[in-house]
A protein has these predicted regions:
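Short, solvent-exposed beta-strand/turn "edge" segments of beta-rich domains on protein surfaces
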Residues: 84, 103-111, 168-172
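Small/polar-rich, solvent-exposed N-terminal microdomains that initiate assembly or binding
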Residues: 1-104
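Short acidic, glycine/tyrosine-flanked loop/strand segments centered on an H-E-D-like triad
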Residues: 111-128
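"Short basic amphipathic alpha-helical interaction patches in structured regions
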Residues: 106-113, 130-139
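Hydrophobic residues positioned within well-ordered beta-strands of beta-sheet architectures
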Residues: 91, 114-118, 175-177
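Short, charged/polar micro-motifs that form catalytic or ligand-binding hotspots
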Residues: 13, 17, 128-133
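Short, cysteine-centered beta-strand-loop-beta hairpins and adjacent loop/turn segments enriched
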Residues: 100-106, 123-128, 184-185
Length: 185
């Protein structure tokens, strides 16, 4: 009697670890499509928010790979791939710290808690805008877009921490916003 052929034993996981690329892409798209954020990133002038809205193509360029690095302002990593010499604003993303939630409880083997990071950096020579500080307004819009969102993980995203951030010998300043997400292991 011939042996019975077994099915493929591999079952793809459906966990937050498997969703990192998709989450980052969705976060970058949400950020780029926001009218205020896109204007604050695209226009380096004090009147950025009163300028005309960007076209959809211009918004897409803010989050798309650009070998020259001239148009991209939203990155799936904390750092930009090139040294920045121009006056610009950036938003970088990070995902980290996924650990079993409340390891002392019985249900912890099914859930993990981790953090989504938003790194907001603005050249210190273009921080001042007509409505206040560019980095503060970027922070407010990102917080508003993602706080209590149900688009990532199994629950809603909550603020976890906010830290001031300075890079490149204080040429760029801004914030590191950490938001907590809970998902299946």
């Amino acid at each position: 009697m011939p042996a019975k052929k077994l099915g493929d034993p591999y079952k793809p996981h459906r966990s937050s670890i498997m969703m990192i690329t998709e989450w980052k892409q969705r976060m970058m798209e949400s950020i780029a499509m926001d009218d205020d954020i896109s204007k604050l990133l695209y226009y380096n002038t004090p009147d950025a928010l009163s300028r005309s809205p960007l076209t959809e193509d211009q918004k897409i360029q803010l989050a798309s790979f650009d070998p020259d690095g001239d148009r991209r302002r939203i990155y799936p990593t904390r750092y930009t791939p090139n040294v920045v010499m121009d006056q610009r604003s950036f938003i970088g993303l990070g995902i980290s710290g996924f650990v079993p939630q409340e390891s002392w409880r019985q249900f912890s083997e099914k859930y993990v808690m981790g953090y989504l990071y938003f790194y907001i950096l603005v050249d210190n020579s273009i921080m001042e805008i007509d409505e206040g500080q560019r980095q503060d307004l970027l922070l407010q819009r990102i917080y508003d877009l993602f706080q209590d969102s149900y688009d990532y993980g199994m629950g809603h995203i909550q603020e976890g921490n906010l830290t001031e951030l300075w890079e490149q010998n204080n040429k760029f300043g801004g914030y590191a916003l950490m938001m907590r997400v809970i998902d299946f292991k």
